[in-house]
Amino acid sequence: MDNWLKICIVVVFAVATTGNEEATPAKLLFSKQILNKYLVEGMDIVIKYSLFNVGGTAALDVQVADNTFGPQDFEVVGGQLKVTIDRIPPGSNATHVVVIRPSKYGYFNFTAAEVSYLPSEYAAEALVGLSSEPGQGAIVPFKEYDRKFSPHLLDWLSFAAMSMPSLVL
């Protein structure tokens, strides 16, 4: 009987303590990825922004801004560099993709994007964070890329035409 009483007390204590938990505020993990293998002048570059809410409440009024790509060096082909997402529920994610086209070749420093959000419905002040930083990347000239990766059809046709006389004899 004494063991039965101890088990009942432990169960009542466990039930009483689990009901008092507060929901943790929203906390966003933010990453920025460049999806292209080669960065080429005049060709599209795909950039993916991923947000994941690891908190216990929804993140509200999420604003993503990336000031890395100036209009003098890059043209925005698809998507937007400044985006607002109304809410990201707890345990879920949101992604955004931007397609840009570089107008110059050379080395370029891809810096972090910025996110700001309200961690709960009652928060008065927005939290500000930064994404992961892809770092420095080389944008190669289109001529160099074309020289390496073009199918060289004209070269193969001229080779075939020059080797035909020796095969016919």
Predicted regions and their residues:
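Short beta-strand elements of extracellular/lumenal beta-sandwich folds
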Residues: F30-A58
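Acidic, serine/threonine- and proline-rich intrinsically disordered appendage/tail regions
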Residues: D2-I9, T17-S31, L39, A123-L169
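OB-fold and OB-like beta-barrel modules that bind single-stranded nucleic acids
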Residues: I47-Y49, V97-V98, T111-V115
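Short acidic/polar inter-strand loop motif in beta-rich domains
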Residues: Y105, Y117-A124
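Short acidic, flexible loop segments centered on an aromatic residue
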Residues: G56-E75, A112-S116
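Short glycine/proline/serine/threonine-rich loop/turn segments at secondary-structure transition edges
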Residues: S103-A112
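Intrinsically disordered, low-complexity Pro/Gly/Ser/Thr-rich segments with frequent PxxP/GP/PP motifs
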Residues: F74-K104
